Design a protein with these regions (language model features):
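N-terminal secretory targeting modules
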Residues: 1-106, 110-129
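Conserved SGNH/GDSL esterase-like catalytic core that processes O-acyl groups on lipids
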Residues: 73, 116, 121-170
Length: 170
């Protein structure tokens, strides 16, 4: 996730998608944008660039923004291309301070909350039903007040993998 504060009367963020936007519609990168810890956007990235309006008003304000990939990296990533701000602040965009604790989680699709938003346990895989913000990894980091990163690849666990249908214990 990328976190920063933005000060101004109007702010937007331009997001960029990678080659994952060319995946089938059920497997394009899924992302979320939060403003002051409230979910603003939860969407699948299907274009090379998307602009999200963070806020707009007459009074200047400071807001905390978080942009987070909710699906596995193997299905594509997103990045912040630009932050556009109308502001009188000398430094309108600043990174959020790092927390004392940083945890990196490495695992398979369960680490990215595979199927957590599916309607049934027999639903086929779709990035639309993965949501890292509901994963054990993210929730653990939140409880420990830690920053976190995750490396999550379907079928490629640390102990074993199931990418071909056969258990791999190499």
């Amino acid at each position: 996730a990328v976190e920063f504060t933005v000060t101004g009367t109007k702010a937007s963020v331009q997001l960029a998608g990678d080659s994952g936007i060319k995946n089938s519609n059920n497997n394009t990168p899924r992302y979320a944008v939060y403003v002051d810890d409230a979910l603003l956007v939860d969407s699948l990235m299907t274009t090379e660039s998307e602009t999200v309006t963070l806020f707009e008003g007459t009074a200047q304000k400071t807001a905390k923004v978080k942009v987070m990939l909710l699906s596995e990296a193997m299905y594509g990533g997103i990045g912040v291309k630009s932050v556009d701000v109308t502001s009188s602040a000398s430094i309108p965009v600043q990174p959020v301070a790092k927390k004392e604790l940083m945890i990196e989680f490495i695992g398979d699709s369960i680490t990215c909350a595979y199927g957590v938003e599916g309607k049934s346990s027999s639903d086929p895989f779709m990035t639309a039903t993965e949501n890292f913000s509901k994963s054990y990894a993210y929730l653990t980091a939140q409880q420990l007040n830690a920053d976190c990163s995750a490396v999550s690849y379907s079928g490629h666990g640390i102990i074993s993998g199931y990418s071909s249908g056969d258990k791999n214990t190499d």
